[in-house]
Amino acid sequence: MLAKGLSLRSVLVKGCQPFLSPTWQGPVLSTGKGAGTSTSSPRSFNEIPSPGDNGWLNLYHFWRESGTQKIHYHQMQSFQKYGPIYREKLGTLESVYIVDPKDASILFSCEGPNPERFLVPPWVAYHQYYQRPIGVLFKSSDAWKKDRIVLNQEVMAPGAIKNFVPLLEGVAQDFIKVLHRRIKQQNSGNFSGVISDDLFRFSFESISSVIFGERMGMLEEIVDPEAQRFINAVYQMFHTSVPMLNLPPDFFRLLRTKTWKDHAAAWDVIFNKADEYTQNFYWDLRQKRDFSQYPGVLYSLLGGNKLPFKNIQANITEMLAGGVDTTSMTLQWNLYEMAHNLKVQEMLRAEVLAARRQAQGDMAKMVQLVPLLKASIKETLRLHPISVTLQRYTVNDLVLRNYKIPAKTLVQVASFAMGRDPGFFPNPNKFDPTRWLEKSQNTTHFRYLGFGWGVRQCLGRRIAELEMTILLINLLENFRIEVQNLRDVGTKFSLILMPENPILFNFQPLKQDLGPAVTRKDNTVN
């Protein structure tokens, strides 16, 4: 049945049957003018508003006026100039950009059973040149689907997620101990400083414990320098990707530029360390017969012979690499917003303490009793999405805003610009988690895309959501969180969005003793 408010031309294009697919349920689209439907004949692709077809000239102006680190602001300015849809060619990369949630719903509804998204060119170049194995991040079609179905059962299914709670709770409690060590070191009754490195280690400890079922020791006083190398390599891999987004990576490789050398070196460390961890834990697991707790994703994959070992290695590598900077950045932004909005922080703390009493300390139950806290993560990703855009290659010809979009066109949904648009989010600069608790579909429909959408959404979504929720519960129980930055820290694009300037936090213990408050039975706040 055709969704109300959409013209036949907007949805039922060649081969697109988003509401009839037997494998997944399409969305119910809301009515309104946002989708720009029209009964007139669709206009041509070349008529889409654009700065011009000279990709190199466009790239020159982009570098001169904005620079790669400000691409998210460049997109906002482009929507203000051209309207809700525009196309732009930067160097060799041409895309159509959209910002309206209704347009996003049409795009994603027509993505088909095997969606294809944009692959970061230097990542592809590295994997091809060095013949590295690939997982679901790089695969497509049936090869992608085969791996993804198996991995969904291990890291997305509700039954699997329950296994991760005790592992992640232990990591979160150890992070609280890290902050108490910092307080003791400063000898001032609180801790003031930057916690980005600690959050990187926390995220790596969390994802590795879920995958391997054992701890890496990243939150101990003395950190394994080899594990720290892995974390540093992930950061370097993201950072060095940006210059090669709009120019052929082979150009950088053939000229033996420092950018390519650093990028390849980072991937080398990621692969070598991930393979080493996988092999070591594999042999340890083979010798074990009795497990007192969930033995991890790797054991489950190996024990069931669910995938070839090389496929397992490739996917484990991608999950490890993708689970460090992304989660840690979202946590840092969440704390930043809470510190700037103390009333919201107190509301969240009250919810957490009530959940602790109701669940009697059972973390698996607690995470089901904190809807406002979960909404705060959504609100954080609205203001500070990890990815500037979500991308899909159109499977068939499509019509958006009454423009013809040919098959195999790269269309990007500008998630950062959408989240800052007052047309979609009233008072968009306000950190207001309650907006996500409203029942009206008009306030939330296709507006939350923090982890992507559909069958190709982020594989680690459920792990990341649980990891962040459990840590925030522990932090809110233990500390009042403030920020020392008087001005906005700014945002820069380094393949993911991150603070332009260091965030200086202040953690004030809520209890007189410096031991982890979560170990106490009472829930009073002194």
Curated annotation (Swiss-Prot):
Alphabetical UniProt keywords: Cholesterol metabolism, Heme, Iron, Lipid metabolism, Membrane, Metal-binding, Mitochondrion, Mitochondrion inner membrane, Monooxygenase, Oxidoreductase, Steroid metabolism, Steroidogenesis, Sterol metabolism, Transit peptide
Enzyme class per UniProt: oxidoreductase
GO CC annotation, single: mitochondrial inner membrane
Gene Ontology molecular-function annotations: cholesterol monooxygenase (side-chain-cleaving) activity; heme binding; iron ion binding
A biological process from GO: C21-steroid hormone biosynthetic process
Gene3D superfamilies on file: Cytochrome P450
Pfam family, one: p450
Positions of the UniProt region annotated as Disordered: 30-49
Its job: A cytochrome P450 monooxygenase that catalyzes the side-chain hydroxylation and cleavage of cholesterol to pregnenolone, the precursor of most steroid hormones. Catalyzes three sequential oxidation reactions of cholesterol, namely the hydroxylation at C22 followed with the hydroxylation at C20 to yield 20R,22R-hydroxycholesterol that is further cleaved between C20 and C22 to yield the C21-steroid pregnenolone and 4-methylpentanal. Mechanistically, uses molecular oxygen inserting one oxygen atom into a substrate and reducing the second into a water molecule.
Protein name: Cholesterol side-chain cleavage enzyme, mitochondrial
Taxonomic classification: Eukaryota, Metazoa, Chordata, Craniata, Vertebrata
